[in-house]
UniProtKB/Swiss-Prot annotation:
It comes from Mus musculus (Mouse). Its EC number is 3.4.21.105. This is Rhomboid-related protein 3. May be involved in regulated intramembrane proteolysis and the subsequent release of functional polypeptides from their membrane anchors. Its main location: membrane.
Length: 404
């Protein structure tokens, strides 16, 4: 499971080193194997005194003289970085970070706070793009609020690996729903079938000791009405987010929402079962919508207000359906219908952990204080819920519905 769809730093560094060697004939001598050493040899040609800095003038001259051979977007970022240094010098580490596809907060700030803003035409103004290039550009504008990040993503995305996590989850959900529908001979409001809860994937309070049920419940849906909305949101929101942020980060937010959803039900709605992937879906969509609101002026996706309104209406309708079903007379008394609290657990994860992930494109999450705050809060909640499930049901002398 990769963190980001672009190649790793070492691979990107070696590829870029070969490109620079083509641009600069003087760098044709044999270089050491380590990626940073490639850059050190080139850097030292412009820093004969080994000061650790080169003048921005020399740096600009190198880029301008080979502008026809160097990727225009990467050249633009390099120039912005060079012009951001008021002392007229660029340090070796910034040079290595850019060439190696390594991003840091200080590196981002050097660009964003520079004297020269990125002034060439934006991605939206470029013509003659292929269908795949237009798709990548569309995804960049749908998910990233900064032009510098959009250009970086556009240049580095290779579709290797593809957004496999969300697609795999979606295919499994659809396949298991169809299988269960054929088995029960019911597709609409499938959850009302008397044998529905007998499936070993459903979370049931009487079987809460079977830990896998806290996750596998996402593969069982109340009916085609719940499945349809969740699948649509996973494909329309989850897949683009995974293309940008990678399967590891998006999978982390999704699974965290799923687990938080079932644990929230076990604490707040103790007698109810749980089905559906709404916990994970609501985590992703809530994080995406919150990121748009927090970066409203920077997000350039078309009709963003209308699309946000449509997304909120769809989420509200699904939540309303879940609330109605929860209090509808049960098809298998005394056990109630599935709970709606998992939706709220997903939202809580989305506006905390999810927002931190989406706001820090290609940044180390370990360096973000908010990340550790929310991870700590999430861990405390999980531990609390585990102890609650072990002790509270007995202490409260709660009468649970019998196992299906």
């Amino acid at each position: 499971m990769g963190e980001h769809p672009s190649p790793g730093p070492a691979v990107a560094a070696c590829a870029e080193a070969e490109r620079i060697e083509e641009l600069e004939p003087e760098a044709e001598e044999r270089l050491p194997a380590a990626p940073e050493d490639h850059w050190k040899v080139l850097f030292e040609k412009f820093d004969p005194g080994s000061t650790g800095y080169i003048s921005t003038g020399k740096f600009r001259s190198l880029l301008e003289s080979h502008s026809s051979k160097l990727d225009p977007h990467k050249k633009e970022v390099l120039l912005a970085l060079a012009d951001s240094h008021a002392d007229g010098q660029i340090c070796y580490q910034d040079f290595v970070n850019l060439m190696s596809n390594k991003r840091s907060n200080s590196f981002r700030q050097a660009i964003l706070q520079g004297n020269r803003r990125l002034s060439s035409k934006a991605l939206l103004e470029e013509k003659g793009l292929s269908l795949s290039q237009r798709l990548i550009r569309h995804v960049a504008y749908e998910t990233l609020p900064r032009e510098i990040d959009r250009k970086w993503y556009y240049d580095s995305y290779t579709c290797c690996p593809p957004p496999w996590f969300m697609i795999t989850i979606t295919l499994l959900e659809v396949a298991l729903f169809l299988y269960n529908g054929v088995l029960l001979d019911q597709f609409v409001l499938q959850v009302t079938h008397p044998r529905y809860l007998k499936n070993s994937l459903v979370y049931h309070p009487q079987l809460r000791a079977q830990a896998w049920r806290y996750v596998t419940y996402i593969f069982m849906h109340a009916g085609v009405e719940q499945l349809g909305l969740n699948v649509a949101l996973q494909l329309l929101v989850g897949v683009p987010l995974e293309m940008v942020h990678g399967a590891t980060r998006i999978g982390l937010v999704y699974v965290a929402g799923v687990v938080a959803g079932s644990l929230a039900v076990s604490v707040a709605d103790m007698t109810a079962p749980v089905v559906g992937s709404s916990g994970g879906v609501y985590a992703l969509v809530s994080a995406h919508l919150a990121n748009i609101v927090m970066n409203w002026s920077g997000m350039k996706c078309q009709f963003k207000l209308l699309r946000m309104a449509v997304a909120l209406i769809c989420m509200s309708m699904e939540f309303g359906r879940a609330v109605w079903l929860r209090f509808h007379p049960s098809a298998y008394p005394p056990c109630p219908h599935p709970s709606f609290v998992a939706h709220l657990g997903g939202v809580a994860v989305g506006i905390t952990l999810g927002v931190v992930v989406l706001r820090n494109y290609e940044q180390r999450l370990q360096d973000q204080s908010l990340w550790w705050i929310f991870v700590t809060m999430y861990t405390i909640f999980v531990l609390f819920a585990v102890f609650w499930n072990i002790f509270a049901y007995t202490l409260l002398d709660l009468k649970l519905p019998p196992a299906p």
